Amino acid sequence: MAEIVTCSNCGKRNRLPAAARGMARCAACHIALPWLTSASDGDFEEVVTASSLPVLLDLWAPWCGPCRVVAPGVERAARTLAGRLKAVKVNVDEAPRVAERYGVQGIPTLLILRHGREVARQVGAVPPPALLRWVKEMISKPAA
């Protein structure tokens, strides 16, 4: 699975495979691109655990009102922290094993992961500015 991301610098449309490693860069001008993708039970390991970047994992469901409040903040974090973060959305209705793996009791649940290991958790709706501050703080901490 791949996402098409338009470079904000040069306008080039770039194909970003969900499971790629490293940093997403524009094929034309080489600046860092925002990396927002999705994962399922079947591809979670490749998309998330293998990532060399910290991952903002958004565990959500389409029927969840607070999840819709959080979604713009996740997208904003991916754009603002391009090259420093990979944002991955997981629909818990379609990926129950991922939700079980991280012991998700309520949604939205936001996790910061490094190599698949949880380093921070936020449960419940968070306004976009507060979410961005939280993510910046969590990814700036040295890996344990």
Features from the language model and the residues they span:
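Short Cys/His-rich micro-motifs in 6-15 aa windows
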Residues: 27-37
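Non-catalytic, surface beta->alpha helical segment in thiol-disulfide oxidoreductase systems
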Residues: 106-107, 111-144
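Short pre-active-site segment immediately N-terminal to redox-active cysteine/selenocysteine motifs
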Residues: 52, 59-63, 106
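A short beta-strand-turn-helix
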Residues: 37-55
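Thiol-based oxidoreductase modules, predominantly thioredoxin-like and allied folds used
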Residues: 38-39, 59, 70-97
